[in-house]
Amino acid sequence: MRSISCSKEYAEDVRNLNIRPEQLDDFFGQKDLIQNLKVFINAAKTRTEALDHVLLHGPPGLGKTTLAQIISKELRVSFRATSGPLLNKAGDLAAVLTTLNAKDVLFIDEIHRLNRSIEEVLYTAMEDFCLDLLVGEGPSTRTLRIDLPPFTLVGATTRLGLLSAPLRDRFGIPLRLEFYSFEELVDIIKRGTKVFSAEIEEDAIQEIACRARGTPRIALRLLRRIRDFVEVKDNKKITHKIADSALSKLGIDKMGLNKLDVDYLRFLFNTSGSVGIDTISIALSEDSGNIEETVEPYLVKISFVKRTPRGRVLTDQGKEYLSLQY
């Protein structure tokens, strides 16, 4: 079995552990979600039970991994992490689950990428805290039942629609993370500047927040790259002028859109009517999954694009943006 590891996004986040909040009270944004999660965690602790299984879903970079880690810290239990693509067979899942202690948190990132055979094994683990594994071959095949301690599965996905209904329904606490407000991103960037020991003007912070697509991961990534420009030029402070110049060099416009976003919008503009995702994928030479996960959510949020049963449609706001930019 491949060892428990991290997805690409999880590995990127690990490099910034000192930026992450470690308790719910320090978590910026997602106010209603956080308040509800506090209730669920405190109730589980009061009953001395394992927290019910949690499903975190929403666009990339909004804090799903961070929340999973905070849940384990709030519960004061161990945290184990893996991802859907790493669990190729039932034995892989069994090897992970049998290492858990009572009430531990198991985090499965990209849970929508679990294959169906693994999902079926997971059903009994989630509901009955046991594993039913087939042992042997042919006529000698038998079922081996392994009892498990009560545990909490925290699944994370950017593609909720790809989860099978039976798996989705086994999560007692489904939580959707939303894009962050401008004010919340400003607070997150300020925290980042303290960790990076970076001196920065308020106008520069606001400029980064405006271009961060409502996403903390992007905000902190842009902050790091701007800091690179500052250090190479031996400047002492991140000014608004420096931030604006660096972001332009990075290909990030005033709305936070990059070349792929603009190419997507222009293709819709040049195509009459609605357009299917596969057609867009071929035209842009870009994976359709990446378009659905990283491009479309923000364009839909800012009302540049509508997703309809017949395909994607450029809105009047999207057309106006293109007319002003090009």
From Swiss-Prot:
The keyword Nucleotide-binding applies. It comes from the Bacteria. Disulfide bonds: none annotated. It is found in: Cytoplasm. DNA binds at R307, R312. It holds the Pfam family AAA_lid_4. Residues 254-326 are annotated as: Head domain (RuvB-H). Residues 181-251 are annotated as: Small ATPAse domain (RuvB-S). Gene3D superfamilies: 1.10.8.60, P-loop containing nucleotide triphosphate hydrolases (3.40.50.300), Winged helix-like DNA-binding domain superfamily/Winged helix DNA-binding domain (1.10.10.10). Keywords: ATP-binding, Cytoplasm, DNA damage, DNA recombination, DNA repair, DNA-binding, Hydrolase, Nucleotide-binding. Residues 1-180 are annotated as: Large ATPase domain (RuvB-L). Mg(2+) binds at T65. GO terms for cellular component: cytoplasm; Holliday junction resolvase complex. It catalyses: ATP + H2O = ADP + phosphate + H(+). GO terms for biological process: DNA recombination; DNA repair. HAMAP family: DNA_HJ_migration_RuvB. Belongs to the RuvB family. Has 3 domains, the large (RuvB-L) and small ATPase (RuvB-S) domains and the C-terminal head (RuvB-H) domain. The head domain binds DNA, while the ATPase domains jointly bind ATP, ADP or are empty depending on the state of the subunit in the translocation cycle. During a single DNA translocation step the structure of each domain remains the same, but their relative positions change. This is Holliday junction branch migration complex subunit RuvB. The gene is ruvB.
